[in-house]
């Protein structure tokens, strides 16, 4: 694998090289686990600190958390609908915050100062395994949402306007996780690659605007992933008449 | 990995991104046109239009990104590299 070991003097760009951990019969990508644990830890710490001493007039971290809560609630409510959005708000919020903090953490934290035996630390979402796992979770949850809300009537959705739609709707169930995972993975990896290549060509000043563009795209991608997840769930629980 | 596979992979990777950029390029152009017309007609709706425009841009962009993923697979994780 990886017949182009791109090793540049300034930006060590290593695509397809990982720090492998052996877990039973599984070979897992250690660097992804380390960064995602750091992201999860940071999020947990933020939430614990923010809710420790809650006040009537929110200040500081509590204020930030309440803003996030409002934001996620609005997102979930517009996509899923007034009736069941409460059940799915934690899931949508977790997806959004995890992806957002992963993307920004990969771009903002100078991971390259920490040397690993092979591979490099970076955004966990720049690994296809992470994004596929998240996308499959979304698939499972919209099936669960549909079945638990409507029972077997959920499958009416497949033949909803006409039975001609049946094959397309079945194919859609496979393309949804595929496009969700590829979109996130491709965007984040592309950001990292563009920055690394630019740093290689012009090490000074020029990469900075591209880095800002990357931050912007990463934030939008987190929003898109959460919005689409909410939309799919909303589509599954929607009542047809 | 023989040289003919390498050459074919590199050419295919270039084509995957290049051809994949055509459609979304046209699409983003016409979406931006619509947004600019909308803002010119109704400047107070600029915030809403901008939000929707950026979201739809990201959707169109992801089509090119699919091409990029194929290109990256060909370059870094080529399944035909013997």
UniProtKB/Swiss-Prot annotation, chain B:
One of its GO terms (molecular function) is proton-transporting ATP synthase activity, rotational mechanism. InterPro entries: ATP_synth_csu_bac/chlpt, ATP_synth_F0_csu, ATP_synth_F0_csu_DDCD_BS, ATP_synth_F0_csu_sf, ATPase_proteolipid_c-like_dom, F/V-ATP_Csub_sf. Coiled coil: none annotated. It is a multi-pass membrane protein. One of its GO terms (cellular component) is plasma membrane-derived thylakoid membrane. The keyword Transmembrane helix applies. It holds the Pfam family ATP-synt_C. The record marks 61 as: Reversibly protonated during proton transport. Keywords: ATP synthesis, CF(0), Hydrogen ion transport, Ion transport, Lipid-binding, Membrane, Thylakoid, Transmembrane, Transmembrane helix, Transport. It is found in: Cellular thylakoid membrane. The chain crosses the membrane at residues 7-27, 57-77. The keyword Nucleotide-binding does not apply. F(1)F(0) ATP synthase produces ATP from ADP in the presence of a proton or sodium gradient. F-type ATPases consist of two structural domains, F(1) containing the extramembraneous catalytic core and F(0) containing the membrane proton channel, linked together by a central stalk and a peripheral stalk. During catalysis, ATP synthesis in the catalytic domain of F(1) is coupled via a rotary mechanism of the central stalk subunits to proton translocation. Belongs to the ATPase C chain family. HAMAP family: ATP_synth_c_bact. F-type ATPases have 2 components, F(1) - the catalytic core - and F(0) - the membrane proton channel. F(1) has five subunits: alpha(3), beta(3), gamma(1), delta(1), epsilon(1). F(0) has four main subunits: a(1), b(1), b'(1) and c(10-14). The alpha and beta chains form an alternating ring which encloses part of the gamma chain. F(1) is attached to F(0) by a central stalk formed by the gamma and epsilon chains, while a peripheral stalk is formed by the delta, b and b' chains. This is ATP synthase subunit c.
